[in-house]
């Protein structure tokens, strides 16, 4: 019997529900607490902590799920195979059943066999199924042979790979840790298709297709390779929905099942090709699923991490659309079809439909502008390279940097021409580019001072969270050229290192404190405070007296400046949370610069913010300010916050103990900076600009408190000045300006009419000076005060009026002469406009340029111009 994919999914979940399993939702496509993974790539990911015995509080012993998965890189990289094989996908759905310290091998195998072969379930022919087991797993082998009664020639023992401890039938989470043998079930499509039996060179498709993998986690692997049996065992199984659906429907390609057919039909309608069996159609059908599910989890295209994977997938799909003759934006048009196909088990697609379509449109618009040029350059280069030769990494990088070609897209195109790429050279150029970008980015500027680690060996204890000034001891003094000194007694720049300090060292986007370090003998002005590794350096100048190493001093920050910095830092946290509320959860901090004057905040977003969005963000922040909410600080551990909604820049390195800054539950972030005690201290928040700084990254600049009031006062002053200039009241400025603009449009129309009338009159007047020589009309005239645009217009109209003509018109304006020569195309075989102009400029001085039918230039000798214009008439006559 034939079933739809949705029916198979429901049958699977119901079957295991009746076997005592709890049906749980699949985890998000972006793993919540696993930094080792960009995307969820299997059903077991959400249960990883249970398998590695970190989570003992899980209340279920038996679970079944449908899990959305994505594989585009690393160990499980299906990206390059998508479209070229019938079974590989970037996005796919995995059915799974799991046992946590409950049933083991016998029940797991019996359940799988019953679901696949019983008449009440999928009713697959037992004769079509083949089995692989790990060579040392005799228990599984005997279950298949003696209990399930599989012919032993259909049970293949798989050993370790050559010269390795790895095996396709022995699952390992890593080099050490939980592991165990697995048994796989294969479906045999029959000997009409090519392919060897499972285990022979990896089981070539398409004859034998793996449909179910059952993993038995029963060992712990030590660093020396020894396997220790676990006291409790686990079962982790996975069956690809797309593959089993193809088997049930007796088709050899996943692209022929109901999950793909509507998409392929729609793509075919948009394309110029005639057959659905096309690699480019398969690529697009796969990629539109992957793109949509990634975007639905609030990821947008960018140049890093999840966003870059999304960009790669979208741009590969666009290129394959180009292969199909699709020249306009098309990906967003496929979304309604996708929702109709997959929306039942994935309601998030319908919920996020508008966002998915808009993100796809924007990314297509960006890439389609450069795709054609990049392809032209690449194909030109490929024509010069012999098959099996290598494309330079430099060109591949140029395509990446200039035309936005992800490297795998270039690899894909080269693969079609049997050409490889110098990847090492590409990576070298890419790494250099990244380094240059870091050096140029003001949010990541390096310290202006370089201190060798061995120069300073005593760390500074920071007390600035609690105190504004403290008694301290000078540990080290560094002067120019990285030299230590025992005393400073002149006014040169120096760096003081104290054993304890209230000065915050520049980090996390927050500028360092300034202030004074002093005692009875001397006073040191701290201009800025820098971090040198874990050591705080006070950079400044001696103002008076002298200071010695080991002196006891008073270190005192500039408190008003610190308070202004704190206000802006807390405002930055409010801004971050507000942006995520208004724009979406895809917004993440990409950098910041927080000073006492203003704040700059870089964030991920792929479109300019409109005025409404900016004002909504301002309103949210100012309401939080008005509520005067307490800003609390908590010392905690990374482990303790893993299950909390805490924002953190995970590219940053955090210590075991971290500071959590909370503004109620509105904003909770890990942060080492200094903050105000109450939101009310901020006073007022005002955004001054919102710009793009790179693809997918926006920057907001904002001010707070007195600086925000100053901005508003400046805007009021500007409005008043404009009102005075317009002789209008401030509340009528818009109407007054609209009236002026309308009047301006009306006057422009009048001027244009008068201009055209003037040109018409000049053309009529010049037509009377026409001289016919042989069959050619010649008009030569010097005008006054007509600009170059007018002369061009006059010459064009005269050439249209006199279909066989030579026109020479000059004009003196502001004591400069301009000249245009026009020759109708039916005369250019006898005389050239450029030749006429060159003869005049040679006699009169000046220069110009043009073509045979039109030329223009400037003349220096204005006095002789009338004489030479008369002479040129004779010369033209001689040439006709």
From Swiss-Prot:
Enzyme class: ligase
Domain of life the protein comes from: Bacteria
SUPFAM superfamilies: Class II aaRS and biotin synthetases (SSF55681), Putative anticodon-binding domain of alanyl-tRNA synthetase (AlaRS) (SSF101353), ThrRS/AlaRS common domain (SSF55186), Translation proteins (SSF50447)
Named cofactor requirement(s): Zn(2+)
Residues the entry annotates as binding Zn(2+): 569, 573, 671, 675
Function according to Swiss-Prot or TrEMBL: Catalyzes the attachment of alanine to tRNA(Ala) in a two-step reaction: alanine is first activated by ATP to form Ala-AMP and then transferred to the acceptor end of tRNA(Ala). Also edits incorrectly charged Ser-tRNA(Ala) and Gly-tRNA(Ala) via its editing domain.
Protein name, entry field: Alanine--tRNA ligase
The organism's taxonomic lineage, starting at the top: Bacteria, Pseudomonadati, Pseudomonadota, Gammaproteobacteria, Enterobacterales
Name of the gene encoding the protein in the UniProt record: alaS
């Amino acid at each position: 019997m034939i079933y739809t994919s949705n029916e198979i999914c429901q049958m699977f979940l119901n079957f295991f529900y009746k076997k005592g399993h709890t049906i749980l939702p699949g985890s998000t496509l972006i793993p919540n607490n696993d930094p080792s993974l960009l995307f969820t790539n299997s059903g077991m990911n959400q249960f990883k902590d249970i398998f590695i015995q970190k989570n003992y509080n899980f209340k279920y012993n038996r679970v079944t799920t449908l899990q959305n998965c994505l594989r585009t890189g690393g160990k499980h990289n299906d990206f390059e195979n998508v479209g070229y094989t019938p079974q590989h996908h970037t996005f796919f759905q995995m059915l799974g059943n799991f046992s946590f310290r409950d049933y083991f091998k016998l029940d797991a195998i019996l359940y799988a066999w019953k679901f696949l072969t019983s008449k009440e379930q999928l009713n697959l022919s037992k004769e079509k199924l083949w089995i692989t087991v790990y060579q040392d797993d005799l228990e599984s082998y005997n279950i298949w042979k003696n209990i399930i009664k599989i012919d032993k020639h259909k049970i293949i023992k798989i050993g370790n790979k050559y010269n390795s401890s790895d095996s396709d039938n022995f699952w390992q989470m890593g080099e050490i840790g939980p592991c165990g043998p697995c048994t796989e079930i294969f479906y045999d499509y029959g000997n009409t298709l090519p392919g060897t039996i499972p285990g022979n060179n990896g089981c070539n498709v398409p004859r034998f297709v793996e449909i179910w993998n059952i993993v038995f986690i029963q060992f712990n692997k030590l660093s020396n390779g020894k396997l220790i049996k676990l006291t409790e065992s686990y079962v982790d199984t996975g069956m690809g929905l797309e593959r089993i659906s193809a088997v049930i429907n007796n088709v050899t390609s996943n692209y022929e099942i109901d999950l793909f057919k509507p998409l392929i039909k729609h793509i075919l309608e948009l394309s110029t090709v005639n057959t659905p069996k096309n690699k480019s159609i398969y690529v697009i059908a796969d990629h539109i699923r992957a793109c949509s599910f990634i975007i639905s989890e609030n990821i947008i295209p960018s140049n890093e991490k999840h966003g870059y994977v999304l960009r790669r997938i979208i741009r590969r799909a666009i290129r394959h659309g180009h292969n199909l003759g699709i020249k306009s934006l098309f990906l967003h048009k496929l979304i309604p079809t996708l929702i109709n196909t997959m929306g039942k088990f994935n309601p998030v697609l319908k919920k996020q439909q508008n966002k998915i379509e808009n993100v796809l449109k924007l990314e297509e618009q960006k890439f389609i502008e450069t795709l054609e040029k990049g392809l032209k350059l690449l194909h030109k280069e490929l024509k010069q390279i012999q098959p099996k030769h290598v494309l330079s990494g430099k060109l591949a990088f140029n395509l990446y940097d200039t035309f936005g070609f992800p490297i795998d897209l270039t690899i894909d195109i080269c693969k079609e021409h049997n050409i490889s790429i110098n990847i090492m050279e590409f990576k070298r150029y890419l790494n250099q580019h990244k380094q240059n970008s870091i050096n140029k980015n003001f949010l990541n500027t390096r310290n202006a001072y370089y201190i060798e680690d061995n120069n300073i060996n005593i760390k500074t204890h920071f007390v600035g969270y609690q105190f504004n000034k403290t008694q301290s001891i000078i540990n080290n003094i560094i002067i120019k050229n990285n030299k230590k000194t025992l005393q400073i007694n002149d006014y040169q720049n120096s760096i003081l290192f104290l054993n304890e300090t209230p000065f915050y060292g520049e980090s996390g986007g927050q500028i360092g404190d300034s202030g004074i370090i002093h005692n009875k003998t001397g006073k040191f002005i701290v201009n800025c405070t820098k971090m040198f590794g874990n050591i705080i350096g006070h950079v400044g100048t001696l103002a008076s007296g002298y200071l010695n190493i080991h002196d006891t001093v008073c270190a005192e920050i500039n408190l008003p400046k610190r308070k202004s910095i704190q206000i802006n830092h807390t405002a930055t946290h409010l801004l971050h949370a507000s942006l995520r509320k208004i724009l979406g959860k895809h917004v993440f901090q990409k950098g910041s610069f927080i000073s006492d004057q203003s704040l700059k905040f870089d964030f991920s977003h792929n479109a300019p913010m409109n005025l409404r969005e900016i004002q909504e963000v301002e309103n949210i922040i100012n309401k939080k300010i008005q509520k005067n909410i307490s800003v609390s600080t908590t010392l905690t551990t990374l482990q303790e916050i893993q299950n909390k909604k805490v924002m953190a820049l995970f590219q940053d390195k955090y210590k075991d103990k971290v500071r959590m800054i909370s503004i109620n539950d509105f904003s909770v972030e890990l942060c080492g900076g200094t903050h105000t005690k109450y939101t009310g201290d901020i006073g007022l928040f005002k955004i001054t600009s919102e710009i793009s700084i790179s693809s997918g990254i926006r920057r907001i600049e904002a001010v707070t408190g007195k600086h925000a009031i100053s901005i508003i006062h400046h805007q009021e002053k500007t409005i008043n000045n404009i009102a005075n200039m317009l002789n209008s009241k401030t509340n009528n400025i818009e109407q007054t300006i609209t009236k002026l603009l309308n009047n301006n449009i009306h006057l422009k129309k009048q001027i244009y009419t008068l201009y055209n009338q003037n040109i018409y009159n000049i053309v009529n007047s010049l037509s009377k000076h026409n001289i016919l020589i042989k069959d050619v009309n010649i008009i030569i005239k010097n005008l006054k005060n007509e600009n170059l645009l007018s002369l061009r217009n006059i010459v064009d109209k005269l050439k249209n009026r006199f279909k066989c003509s030579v026109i020479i018109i000059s004009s003196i304006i502001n004591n400069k002469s301009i000249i245009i020569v026009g020759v109708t195309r039916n005369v250019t075989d006898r005389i050239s406009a450029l030749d006429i102009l060159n003869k005049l400029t040679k006699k009169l001085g000046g220069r110009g340029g043009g073509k045979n039918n039109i030329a223009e230039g400037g003349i220096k000798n204005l006095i002789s111009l009338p004489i030479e214009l008369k002479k040129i008439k004779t010369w033209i006559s001689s040439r006709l």
